Every structure is written in C-alpha cells, then in structure tokens.
Amino acid sequence: MLKISLMDQSDLELAYEIEKEVNPTPWSKKNFFSSFEVGHNSIVCRHENNLIGFAIFSLVKEECHLLNIAVTKSWHRKGAGSLLMNTLIKQSKVLGAKKVFLEVRSKNFNAISFYKNYKFVQDALRINYYAGNNPDDAVMMSLDI
C-alpha cells in the first residue's frame, strides 16, 4: 500500500538519490537540502516504509509552484506519482491556492502527458531554460484548482 507523509530530514538522502536517478540534470545536493531547510512544502510517498517518491512545492498567496516531483524508476506508472500529485493539489487547495504552476523539460514527453492528464495547460515556452549537459526548453504549465 502506498502512503504519503510530510518529508522530514531523515528522508533527504534517499529523496536526493531518487532525484539523481530520474532527473537528467538533478538539483545540486546543496540546493535540494536547502529547499527543505527554507521550508518549502515537501511530501514523500512510501511503499512498505520504503521511500519511492517525493514532491516539493512552494505556496505564495493563491499560487502553488511545483518545484520538483520524482518517483524512482521501478515505481513509474504504478500510482505513486498520481498519489503525490493528488495530495499536492489537495494540500494546496486547503492552504488557499487557486492555481498550480510548473515548468517541465520540453523533451520530457512522459511528464508532459502526466500533467495533461491532470488538465494542466501549456502557458508558454521558455527557450534554453535548462542549461548544462542536457540543454532544453521549458514548457510552462498551469492548472486551475
């Protein structure tokens, strides 16, 4: 059974391992840990007490910004990402958000399809948003909640 809980400090190392596993240009460890330390909302998904995914988001007034969401590859398409997204949307609504924003790599077709299943719409395209070894454009998406 999958369970969602708030991320705590003891989850950071495992969550960061998932980040490195699935993200072609993962956040630096410093930025990943700093996001938790500055108080961004962070939730994790577990299966039998094993951490298999996480979501990090910030809330400002009526806006939720999905900063990062990842599920270990062995759990892709098994409901963990959906449970994280459903929980994020529900928590955001409770906290007064009216809209969720995100940016996603233009070549990440699986993620774009996942977001479209939630009725996210494309708002804009940021050219050369992602730099480094895997440059890419960012698709800006939003969802009214």
Please name every model-derived segment.
Residues 2, 6-74, 85-87, 91, ...:
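Acetyl-CoA-dependent GNAT
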Residues 66, 100-104:
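Conserved hydrophobic beta-strand within the GNAT/NAT acetyltransferase core sheet
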Residues 72, 76, 103-107:
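Residue-level recognition of the GNAT/N-acetyltransferase active site
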Residues 77-90, 113-117:
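Conserved acetyl-CoA-binding loop-helix of GNAT-fold acetyltransferases
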Residues 78, 95-98:
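Short coil/turn segments at alpha/beta junctions that flank glycine-rich nucleotide-binding fingerprints
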Residues 85, 108-111, 128-133:
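Short glycine/proline-centered loop/turn elements that form peptide/ligand docking sites
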Residues 103, 116, 121-137:
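Conserved catalytic-core motifs of GNAT/GCN5-like acyltransferases
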Residues 137-145:
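Terminal substrate-recognition subdomain of acyl/acetyltransferases
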